[in-house]
Amino acid sequence: MGNILRCFKGDDDGGDHYPYYKPTSRPHYQPPHYHGQPAAPPAPPQQQPLGPHGVTPSTVGVAALAHDLLNFESTSMVPDGLSQHVVSSRKAQVKWYQKLLEAYKNTTPPPKTPADAAQLIARALNMIQRADLEITSNYVSPQGILEFYNFPIPSLPSASSNYQPSSLPEGVQFVLNTLPVYDKCIGDGDGFTAYVSTTDPRESANVPLEVHELVIARTQARKCRDYQSADALLSSLDEAGYKIISCSDDEVLARKYRIRMRGIDAPELKMPYGRESRNALVKLIGGKSVKIYVYDLDQFGRYVGDIYCNNLFIQEQMLKNGHAWHFKTYDKRPEFARWEREAKAANRGLWASGNPEKPWDWRRDQRNARQDAIQVY
């Protein structure tokens, strides 16, 4: 998880890697004593209330979270004392820490204050029961994961910011749950190529017979060490819209989907801010699995949809940070217009240039220029 977690790990000598932190006990600090000097007087009694980690909010609450995430990454175990403070099962807690670990890794710089850490937890876990997140008037106990770490209760994100629909919105045809998106498969700020495993129920029933035969033939070729034929069969799979992807020392057959993000239009790569827009999308979804609510198939054979990743609505992030335009011609959602106005008012991203060229105007001019060149020829 980077240097911030390693700094809490200590020496690899087989001892306690985090000697001053115990989830179910309170720490004891021994002041340093140097030879020839009088011992330091006893420390005054701790006046601030101690939380379940035995620390105050202003000391090592953030370090405790970092330690727990490091421990979870190594052992898949959640803190022992957490069950005393939340109502959900241990299985649910494991899912929380998976989300927290991913959110922590993707946060730069990592949280340094209790308030920052509380915001990270709230963003990553905004879909869990509120009673598990904080103290409420209806729940005196359990106290919640924020209280477990002595963190303040932040303002929870609004539903429009980090909400994935629990039922299919009107117009959605189906949902895709992708494998992690390769950075190189992100073409610009509003489109990318994604792969969905054929173990997905929706996909498994629709794999063509010819694809099954190609996979079997490739497996046989590899057994015979005929790697030239195996590579040729991979090319045939790609032409059929499928790909064999290596995942955790295993191979997965996946279907290829070309995706167009609904309701936004990002600068083309050759336009000013084009590469910055693409890089912003890479940071949001690169190397991560995404959920795609598919509405339609466009004239170029791309699946048009809403994109969610780590509970973030990706179009919202692109619009709010000035990485894309609201494509009003094809999407009238008022929140899209509002997010674009917010970015424009704050001069974020592409709006910093004052009057950026619209990508649809740029494409029209490019088409006209090509047409003029053909007529001259």
Swiss-Prot record:
UniProt-annotated binding residues for Ca(2+): D190, D265
Chain residue ranges for the region called Disordered: 15-57
InterPro entries named in the record: SNase_OB-fold_sf (IPR035437), Staphylococal_nuclease_OB-fold (IPR016071)
Subcellular localization, as worded in the UniProt entry: Cell membrane
Residue ranges of the TM segments: none
Key words, A-Z: Calcium, Cell membrane, Endonuclease, Hydrolase, Lipoprotein, Membrane, Metal-binding, Myristate, Nuclease, Palmitate
Pfam families: SNase
Broadest EC class assigned to this enzyme: hydrolase
Catalytic site: R260, E268, R302
Protein name: Probable staphylococcal-like nuclease CAN3
Lineage: Eukaryota, Viridiplantae, Streptophyta, Embryophyta, Tracheophyta
